[in-house]
Amino acid sequence: MEGLLYNSWDIINLYIMNEKATFFGHPIGLRTLFLTEMWERMSYYGMRGIMVLFMTAGVSGINPGLNFSAAEANAIYGAYIGLVYFMVVPGGWLADNIFGHQKAVLAGALIITLGHFTLAIPITQTFFLGLLFIILGTGLLKGNISTIVGRLYENNDSMRDSGYTIFYMSINIGSVLGFLICGGLGEKLGWHWGFGAAGFGMAIGAYQ
C-alpha cells in the first residue's frame, strides 16, 4: 500500500519540479489530491449520516444498534464533530514540524481507514475506538492535503484559485457518494455494512 501511495505522491513532486503533465489544464498532482479528498469525504459524510441512527437503534431487531437515548447520541455526535475539527490544529503542527505534509496525509488516510473498519466490527466495544481512530486520522489529513494543493502552483499563478475550486468539488461529490452508498447499505443491510463501505472508500482514497 505504501509503495502505491508514494508513487502517486511522486507525481506531485515531479510536477513541483516542473514536469508538465496536466489534469484539466492543472498540475497532474491535483488528480491524486482530488480523488484522495473525494473518497475521504465519502467515508466521513457516509459514516456521519448513519452514526446517530446506529446509536439510537434498539439492541434487538433486524438492524440493531446501541440503544442510546437521543440526548446521549447527539452529545456524542457533537463531541465527535468538535474533536475532528479541533485535531486539525495539532495535525498541522505535526506536519509542519515533524512528519511533513505528504507523510501526514498518508498516515491520516491509513488511520481513518482503520477507524472505519473498526466501526464495521459488529461489537459494541469497538465503536468508540473506531471514532478515536477517525478523529486522529482526520486531524492529520484534512488541513494538510489542502496545503499540498497550494504547493502545486507558484505564488502568483492565476490558476491556483481555479485549482482549489476543482479540489473543493471533490468534497461535494464525496459527500453525495457517502450518503448514497453508506446510508443505503447501512439502512438496508445493517449499520456495520455502511461503516465497512466508508472504510472501503477511504482505502480507495489511500491508494490514489
Each model region followed by its residue ranges:
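Conserved MFS/SLC helix-loop-helix module at the cytosolic interface between two early adjacent transmembrane helices
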Residues: 89-110
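Symmetry-related core transmembrane helices of the 12-TM Major Facilitator Superfamily/SLC fold
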Residues: 193-208
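Intracellular juxtamembrane helix-capping segments at the cytosolic ends
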Residues: 141-154
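Hydrophobic core of transmembrane alpha-helices in multi-pass small-molecule transporters
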Residues: 126-141
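Short amphipathic helix-loop junctions that connect adjacent transmembrane helices
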Residues: 50-72
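C-terminal ends and interior cores of transmembrane alpha-helices
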Residues: 110-127
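Central cavity-lining transmembrane alpha-helices of secondary-active solute carriers
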Residues: 78-93
